[in-house]
Amino acid sequence: MTSQPDPRDDEANPLGVRLRERRRQLGLTLKEVAVGAGLSVGFISQIERGITAPSLSSLVSVARVLNMDVGAFLSQPRAEGGITRHDERPVYAVSPNSLTYERISASFPGNVLRSVIIHEPPGHRSEPIAHEGEEMFYVLDGAVTVEVAGERNVLEAGDSLHFPSTRIHSSWNHTDRPSTILWIGTMDVFGDAPPDGS
């Protein structure tokens, strides 16, 4: 891929600015990026202006349209081996004051599942998105509303929802407490799949 921004430049060059610079470098409009990423034009504009932060899956979708690896915009922990220890997993975020993540899956030849633990603050709403693959939400603590193709599902601790990611979906922590969710999906949210996609 072409020259990629250094994800460590976050403070000097915020995510939105770097995304806008790359979009302009490619001569793409906001609409072209939005359509390609399965997001709204308004949402892409808000990311570029630093008004909102994308979820991990939305950032991956935008990075793909911009012909970049998500690692160009976000430093994520690598998973060495197939085991992660609860007291050793780093917590990371796309931007300050957004969702935080703990990577719990590894990468190896042929793997198709990716998984993270998501810590969602009270009142947080994710943007509606549709993309390839499938995913599952399993609520570990708290509660969250997951909307899939217009159908709202309130999930509490112990509840799960499995659906094709090609259906427009979003989530919302409708409570006044943080929620913790195990997310499992086939989208390469880490950007470390082998080049052939396997």
What role is predicted for each listed range?
Residues 38-54:
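Recognition helix of helix-turn-helix/homeodomain-like DNA-binding domains
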Residues 99, 165-191:
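Ligand-binding loop in jelly-roll beta-barrel domains
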Residues 132-150:
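Glycine- and acidic-residue-biased ligand/ion/polar-headgroup-sensing regions
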Residues 31, 42, 60:
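Residues within helix-turn-helix
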Residues 90-128, 134, 183-185, 189:
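A short glycine-rich, His/Asp/Glu-containing loop-to-beta-strand
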Residues 149-164:
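Short acidic-glycine-tyrosine-enriched beta hairpin
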Residues 56-112:
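A short, N-terminal "cap"/entry segment at the start of jelly-roll beta-barrel domains
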Residues 17-34:
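Short basic helix-loop element that most often maps to the first helix and adjoining turn
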